[in-house]
Amino acid sequence: GLGDVYKRQGDVKKGITLDVSIGSRSAKSDSRYQGTEAKESRIVSQGNIRIKSDENIAVKGSQITGENVTLQAGKDISLTAAENRKTTEGNSRSKGAGITASFGIGGLQNVGISAGKSKGNMEEEIMTHTGSAVTAKETLAMESGKDLNITGSKAGGKKVEVKTGNNLSIESLQDSHTYHSRDKESGIHLQRDITVRPDTGKKKMDDPYFSIGKKTDTTDSTYISVTKQAGIYAGKEGYDIQV
């Protein structure tokens, strides 16, 4: 820049310098997004709700709410969660090259040539769950001929009555957030300096300086956690569970 003062091994030069550079650069990036989101269904009543099936009763990512709620199935009752998933992918690329020259009072001082390129990619995925909820203000009764499965969901009331012909299973689900990125850069630089010997006043071209640089940055992150506990919840009148 203007007013640069520099000193180098045995050569001393003070004065005004002018830096000139010519170059070009191009860059391109793209991203893709994909997502699915559950929209819950609802059965809501100020009175009683009774659902009976000779086969199975399956509730997924939905709500059933009433004064007294009864679920009766000849086979299985399943309260499960719906999945919400968001995925983002991205890529970027760039490259460039340039020539630089520095001029001082004595003329040309150095010439440099540089070139470089970079590329990167990233992937991110977020998965959450929308659980089912079966809630009674008073009594919740669930009776299955075979299994009662509660996965990532809740069932509750002031009093809860459960009767199964086989198994009772309760399982919480884990939400997750994963992120991966990788960025790579590389470049080269060639430079030659021209100096003036103070004893002779003659110009000489120094040995060329050549450098190569490479860099890679990688990020990997994974977060997994149960954010909502599945379960059967009873109020002051408690549970009556028969398995």
Question: What function would you assign to each model-found segment?
Answer:
Residues 1-243:
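Binding/recognition "hotspot" determinant
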